[in-house]
Amino acid sequence: MVVRPMMLRSSVAPGRQLLLSSARQRTASQWLSRAGASSRLSGQRFFADIKPPTTAAPTPATPSSESAVPPETVPKPSPAGQESTLPPSTPPTPAPKGGRFRRFLLYLLLTSGFAYGGGVFLALKFDNFHDFFTEYIPYGEESVLYFEERDFYRRFPNTLRNQNRLNPTPRDEGNKITIPSKSGLTSKVAEEEISGADVSQKGPHMSATPAQKSSEAQTKPAAAKPEDKTTAVVKAKEDKAAKEAEKKEEPRQPAIPAVTPLEFAQVNEGDEAIVQELVKTFNDMITVISADENSGKYSQPVAKAKEELQKVGEKIIAVREEARRAAQEEIQQAHATFDESARELIRRFDEMRAADAAQYREEFEAEREKLAHAYQEKIRTELQRAQEVAEQRLKNELVEQAIELNRKYLHEVKELVEREREGRLSKLNELTANVSELEKLTSGWREVIDSNLRTQQLQVAVDAVRSVVDRSAVPRPFVRELVAVKELAAEDPVVEAAISSINPAAYQRGIPSTSQIIERFRRVADEVRKASLLPEDAGIASHAASVVLSKVMFKKDAVAGSDDVESVLYRTESLLEEGNLDAAAREMNSLSGWAKILSKDWLVDVRRVLEVKQALEVIETEARLQCLRVE
């Protein structure tokens, strides 16, 4: 039910396009007719955005006449042609904000804009720079073309005024014939022209166009009958002479009214361009016939021609109605086709939905069977496990019973042995007492030997830790060696306290050796010397100056009792070379400010090394004390 309206709505759009395509094919292309327009603009087509109101076509006097456009129908100049050609003004510069980068970016944008505008101006003035600018500068060609078009519209503001006018189609009028003035005219017509004081009659005071049409209408009968040209001229001269004589001798006679002109043909239903053209041509013929004296004898043929013309208009209307009816039938047929397609689509959708429902049902049944099978397997497994537990419990009970039986058996055997000892082996107790004393002596010496062995092993483990700490090229963890020391200490509180005093990061990551401490101190000393030249609120310039001065600064000897950075560094380096890490760390700890902050990591490493060495010395001392206690 949702698809059908959408299908019907889509079927209406092609029907409208079919009806509008025939009207668009009859639309003529419109061209720019101004001589100043460029060749690029003259080759484009333009269509009217708004259809002008249709008015009754003026009846021309002759086929060669062209209808003049009244001044009120001339379209007003479009405001686009009168726009100012000045480029858009640059927006006012915002208030300067803090920050060098913002000012630099603002100046860069303004400079680029002025440079680009100057390039466009030079490209409009010089041809060589125009070629360079349009070829190598991005969007240069579009900018130059835009300003050229603006300049062209400024110089020719009426260029866009007549872009929707249709150029008159040239007509084949044949060879034009010029007839002398007053050729073939009678005295009656002359009198009518003389008596033209009536303002109700047509004349130059009403419109200049009908006079031109009448003059052109007079040329057509003369062109139609060239053999009567000479006779008409002679007759006109004789009539003129007789008229002058009558004026002198007799009084002026009243003018005879002119022949009543024939009515023009009108086809109200003929709104087609072809019908209007045919009516225009027929009216031209009526105008020519009306200009003749014997126009009365052509009234019946003209009336018959009007009827035929009306029939032609009716036939055209009938053909158009038939075409509209056929188009309506096609649209209805298309609607029916789309309705059938919509029903077919709905049917397919229902089939697909039913198929999907069946598939989902099958999948549901399959999934249900899988779940049931999984639950059955789970129940079977639980039962098997319960059975195994019961069997194991039974086995344990049997084992307990067997152990109890063995215990009873041993008790009975022991009682039997005691009885036997009381009888035959009375001296066995004395022998056992002697053996016990020997075992006590042996265990005492064994404890002494074990204590000495543990002390030696502890000393070896401490030496292994010291070798890892002092002889490794890179920091190496000594967790295994420290664990061995702790196991050999046999829960000695002194050794455990010494091991617990070591930082876990020291034996997990390792500690640097003395040479590494000295090498790192030299790198830290360089940075400390650089930082010693910086004030508290140092900026980028101060840091740069500190780096430069640290390169050229000379090292000085330590002065006794001096607390400056260079003296402290010199004393620390001397103590490190002597191997006195504790005193060196105390000297570096006396620094302050950035120097102390930069040497903080180095002090942490030195403290870790000192903690490990002190702990190892405590463990070695405890091992020696244990050896002395045993002795």
Curated annotation (Swiss-Prot):
Q: Where is the composition biased (Basic and acidic residues)?
A: 225-252
Chain ranges on the Mitochondrial matrix side, renumbered to this chain: 48-103
Q: Which UniProt keywords apply?
A: Coiled coil, Membrane, Mitochondrion, Mitochondrion inner membrane, Transit peptide, Transmembrane, Transmembrane helix
One Pfam family name from the record?
Mitofilin
Gene Ontology biological process terms in this record: cristae formation
GO CC field = MICOS complex
Low complexity compositional bias: what residue ranges? Answer: 52-71
From which residue to which does the transit peptide run? 1-47
Recorded superkingdom: Eukaryota
Mitochondrial intermembrane topology ranges = 125-631
Major localization class: mitochondrion
TM spans, by residue? Answer: 104-124
> What is this entry's stated membrane topology?
Single-pass membrane protein
Subunit record text: Component of the mitochondrial contact site and cristae organizing system (MICOS) complex.
- Assigned protein family: Belongs to the MICOS complex subunit Mic60 family.
Please state what the protein is called. Answer: MICOS complex subunit mic60
What is the scientific name of the source organism? Answer: Aspergillus niger (strain ATCC MYA-4892 / CBS 513.88 / FGSC A1513)
Gene of this entry: mic60
